[in-house]
C-alpha cells in the first residue's frame, strides 16, 4: 500500500514537468501590433489581414511594433507580386540591426525570430515588397497551418506534372495526399505554366493541406488559353518545353511519373503538352548525349497518364487514411481545391466519377512490366 501511495505521489510530482515539456502553440499577436507604413506605400494593415490574396500592402519596408509583453518569435508572410529575398531588422540600441533573413524566394514564407518588439520587414534588393497576408506569432510552437516550406532534397519517388495550379487536384485527385502523407513517398509537384501571385499562394495552401512540405517546382511558361497541342507548342516553342520537362526528370530522378490525359481532359492545350512532352522526355532523359548540361541521365520506371485507356487502373480515394485522422484522400483533395478561391467561379469540382474521373489512370510506359493488381502506382517497384 505504501509503495503504491509513494508511486502515486511521484507521478503527481512529475506531471508539471511533463506538461512543461509540451510546448504551447504560439499565439497570433498580429491584431495587437502597431503597423507603420513606409513613405509612398500603398495598401493598409487591413489589406494584410482580410484573408484575401487579391489585396495587399506595397512599400519600401513595413515597420511593426508588438505589445510590451508580447515580442515576436515568428513571422509568416504571403507575398503578392514576384517573390524576392527579404530580411527582418530589429531596433537595437538606437539602430536597425539584421535579425533574420530569407533568400529562398518562397511565395509563402515563415521566418523564426528571437523575440523582437520592434521590427522592419525589408526587401534585400533595392526594391519594394508586396505583402498579401501577414501573421506575427508570440512564443511557442508554430501552428500547423503556418507553412514552413523546406527546399527540395534528394531523389523523388513520384513526380506529378500539372499544367496549372489546381489541376493537380481536379484531375489527379488523391494522388498527392495519399502517396505523400499516407504512403510516405517522396513526392515532387511540378507545374508547366507560370501563375499569378494569387494562384501561387493558393496552390501552396492546397499542397500544404495535402501533406506536402517541400517547396514545389513552379512553372516557367506563360499561361495561354487554347485547345491545340500545336498552337501551344507554337507559342512556347517545343524545344524549350522538352528541355524543361527532360530537366525535371534528370533533376528529381523519379521512379513514377503522373501527368495529364493525352487529349487534355476537356481539350486544354497545356494539358496536352504535359502528356506529349513527358512521353518524349522519357527517352531524352535517359540519353546521355541529349543536352548533358541538364544533368546525369535518368530512366524512369513508370509513366501514368490520366484517363489513358490501356493498362488502366482505378484508384480508391474513398478509404479512411490514418495520416489525415480518418479523412479520405478524396476529402483532402476536395478541401485542398477549396483553397483555390480564385477558381471557384469556373464550375469545376473535384470528382472521382464521370468523364474526367480523377482516380482513373493508364500505364503508358513501364520498365518493370505491366501492373497485375492494378491498385497502386508503385506496383513492381520496391
Residue ranges and their predicted role:
Residues 1-6:
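Positively charged n-region of N-terminal signal peptides that target proteins for export
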Residues 7-8, 204:
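Intrinsically disordered, low-complexity segments enriched in polar/charged small residues
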Residues 8-16:
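Bacterial N-terminal signal peptides
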Residues 9-10, 171, 351:
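Enrichment for repetitive, rod-forming helical segments
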Residues 18-23:
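Sec-dependent signal peptide cleavage junction
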Residues 24-55, 79-81, 86, 150, ...:
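The feature marks non-catalytic terminal segments
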Residues 30-34, 39-43, 47-62, 68-72, ...:
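Active-site beta-strand->loop->alpha-helix modules in alpha/beta enzyme cores, enriched
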Amino acid at each position: 500500500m505504501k509503495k503504491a501511495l509513494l508511486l502515486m505521489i511521484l507521478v503527481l510530482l512529475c506531471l508539471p514537468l511533463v506538461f512543461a515539456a509540451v510546448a504551447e502553440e504560439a499565439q497570433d499577436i498580429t491584431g495587437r501590433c502597431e503597423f507603420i507604413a513606409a513613405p509612398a506605400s500603398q495598401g493598409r494593415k487591413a489589406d494584410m489581414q482580410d484573408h484575401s490574396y487579391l489585396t495587399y500592402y506595397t512599400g519600401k519596408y513595413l515597420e511593426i511594433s508588438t505589445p510590451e509583453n508580447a515580442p515576436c518569435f515568428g513571422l509568416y508572410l504571403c507575398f503578392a507580386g514576384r517573390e524576392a529575398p527579404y530580411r527582418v531588422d530589429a531596433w537595437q540600441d538606437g539602430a536597425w540591426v539584421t535579425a533574420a533573413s530569407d533568400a529562398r524566394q518562397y511565395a509563402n514564407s515563415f521566418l523564426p525570430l528571437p523575440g523582437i518588439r520592434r521590427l522592419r520587414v525589408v526587401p534585400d534588393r533595392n526594391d519594394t515588397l508586396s505583402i498579401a497576408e501577414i501573421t506575427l506569432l508570440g512564443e511557442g510552437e508554430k501552428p500547423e497551418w503556418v507553412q514552413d516550406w523546406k527546399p527540395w532534397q534528394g531523389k523523388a519517388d513520384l513526380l506529378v506534372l500539372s499544367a496549372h495550379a489546381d489541376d493537380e487536384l481536379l484531375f489527379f485527385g488523391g494522388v498527392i495526399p495519399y502517396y505523400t502523407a499516407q504512403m510516405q513517398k517522396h513526392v515532387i509537384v511540378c507545374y508547366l505554366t507560370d501563375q499569378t501571385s494569387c494562384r501561387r499562394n493558393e496552390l501552396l495552401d492546397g499542397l500544404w493541406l495535402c501533406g506536402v512540405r517541400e517547396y514545389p517546382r513552379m512553372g516557367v511558361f506563360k499561361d495561354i488559353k487554347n485547345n491545340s497541342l500545336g498552337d501551344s507548342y507554337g507559342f512556347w516553342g517545343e524545344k524549350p518545353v522538352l528541355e524543361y520537362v527532360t530537366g525535371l526528370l534528370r533533376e528529381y530522378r523519379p521512379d513514377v511519373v503522373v501527368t495529364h490525359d493525352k487529349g487534355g481532359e476537356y481539350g486544354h492545350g497545356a494539358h496536352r503538352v504535359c502528356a506529349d512532352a513527358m512521353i518524349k522526355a522519357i527517352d531524352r532523359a535517359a540519353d546521355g548525349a541529349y543536352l548533358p548540361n541538364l544533368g546525369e541521365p535518368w530512366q524512369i520506371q513508370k509513366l501514368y497518364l490520366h484517363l489513358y485507356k490501356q493498362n488502366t487502373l482505378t484508384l480508391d480515394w474513398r478509404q479512411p487514411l490514418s495520416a489525415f485522422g480518418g479523412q479520405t484522400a478524396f476529402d483532402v483533395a476536395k478541401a485542398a481545391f477549396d483553397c483555390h478561391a480564385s477558381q471557384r467561379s469556373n464550375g469545376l469540382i473535384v470528382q472521382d466519377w464521370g468523364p474526367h474521373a480523377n482516380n482513373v489512370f493508364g500505364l503508358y510506359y513501364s520498365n518493370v512490366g505491366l501492373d497485375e493488381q492494378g491498385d497502386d502506382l508503385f506496383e513492381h517497384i520496391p
